[in-house]
Amino acid sequence: MSYSVMFALLLLTPLLFSLLCFACRKRRLSATRTVTVLHSLGITLLLILALWVVQTAADAGEIFAAGLWLHIDGLGGLFLAILGVIGFLTGIYSIGYMRHEVAHGELSPVTLCDYYGFFHLFLFTMLLVVTSNNLIVMWAAIEATTLSSAFLVGIYGQRSSLEAAWKYIIICTVGVAFGLFGTVLVYANAASVMPQAEMAIFWSEVLKQSSLLDPTLMLLAFVFLLIGFGTKTGLFPMHAWLPDAHSEAPSPVSALLSAVLLNCALLVLIRYYIIICQAIGSDFPNRLLLIFGMLSVAVAAFFILVQRDIKRLLAYSSVENMGLVAVELGIGGPLGIFAALLHILNHSLAKTLLFCGSGNVLLKYGTRDLNVVCGMLKIMPFTAVLFGGGALALAGMPPFNIFLSEFMTITAGLARNHLLIIVLLLLLLTLVLAGLVRMAARVLMAKPPQAVNRGDLGWLTTSPMVILLVMMLAMGTHIPQPVIRILAGASTIVLSGTHDLPAQRSTWHDFLPSGTASVSEKHSER
């Protein structure tokens, strides 16, 4: 099968199911059942197709389709795998969550059709970001993710959710406009120096000629790009949309926003980071990333300590973790880059679990207020264990996966003489740990309210959490070889732009859990 057919199936599947879900609005009597079946089929096909494309790209190194317009390499493969897995799990969770909302009159069957329609449309726009090799299409796809997900944020039609949706649209549209300025600067400069100016629209072609780009223009372009796509990533001080959107959206949408959408913007930023490092060196980009990253971690850490809304707390944790990824990229080097990519994966798993858990809390307690949400171990013990495990993982406790990427970060920072940054980072991560542990202790063990019915929710709202917790434990103790292969391929691409590739073999694979280093070493020898 040709790559063009493969990409067409991948991109058109969520778009087709989006249209079918919207069409179910006309089947008023059987809309709920029909749209649920369509949704289930759509997310299953998406998972299969995404993993198929990732496997194909890993075997081939990189693949192109539609000329040079569509492209998946090792870096894109990592983000596509995350999108496919998280899209599937949040899709499964959505079935149980939305069934409860419809049964209790929070949503009508017609609105449920709208929800699933926009859910698949949102997946399509994020797929377009990940697979696009065209700089302008990449930017347009980022903008499209805002529009498609804004409807999901405001799906309940309440004043607070509509305000959050409009705030999200306005801030991200203004922010991403800066990204367009940076994109135009890169394109215009590339078109003036490349033998074929029309090829300057393609990222892979610009990368080949990036050493010819004007350093002054690229320095300015990176400032615009960091502000623009950093807004969508949730970096401070452009993060103001994120807490409101995450807290007001339905919980499965909150999980998608945090675990996939932020990654999409980060992927675009990393792709430009590679080009800019080739053009002007890594010192200036790394310095900016360290500044924005540390500010994001610092501000988020203090907000995590004082939050009393469980979903807003998790939203600020997303700001903190995106800041930490920026710090890891800013530290640089083979270990720092690998830690950043590993942390992106780890954060996606942990945050999806916790937003699903917070959704179960909201369904059971009817509130997100941490002064009311207490005694989960007595109210719904199975969910409580899963939620507690997710909270410990997000806090960076062993043997969970985030401990490994944070340990790599500390080691990379010390190895590259960033002692002050590492000391400050450790202090801030201690504050985050305190905030998350305090939240978990209160939610799990405080005296439960008498009016709340006891008993866990259905398997549709707990099975995704089980899968995620198992994956996090596996990633913290013995990372599967296919995952190592994807991470190694992604880190190789980023390192090729920072000129640190020759040192790769002797650094990051030594920090992996026992039994997983061998495959990474084989990959680095290719």
Swiss-Prot record:
Keyword Repressor: no
Cited InterPro entries: ComplexI-like_HydComp, ND/Mrp_TM, Proton_antipo_N
Family: Belongs to the complex I subunit 5 family.
Source species of the chain: Escherichia coli (strain K12)
Keyword check for Lyase: no
One Gene Ontology term of the molecular function aspect: oxidoreductase activity
This protein's name: Hydrogenase-4 component F
GO CC terms in record: formate dehydrogenase complex; membrane; plasma membrane
Alphabetized UniProt keyword annotations: Cell inner membrane, Cell membrane, Membrane, Oxidoreductase, Transmembrane, Transmembrane helix
Membrane topology: Multi-pass membrane protein
EC identifiers of the protein: 1.-.-.-
Subcellular location: Cell inner membrane
Membrane-spanning segments: 4-24, 34-54, 75-95, 122-142, 168-188, 217-237, 256-276, 286-306, 322-342, 384-404, 417-437, 457-477
GO biological process: anaerobic electron transport chain; anaerobic respiration; DNA damage response; formate oxidation; glucose catabolic process
Disulfide bond entries: none
Main function: Possible component of hydrogenase 4.
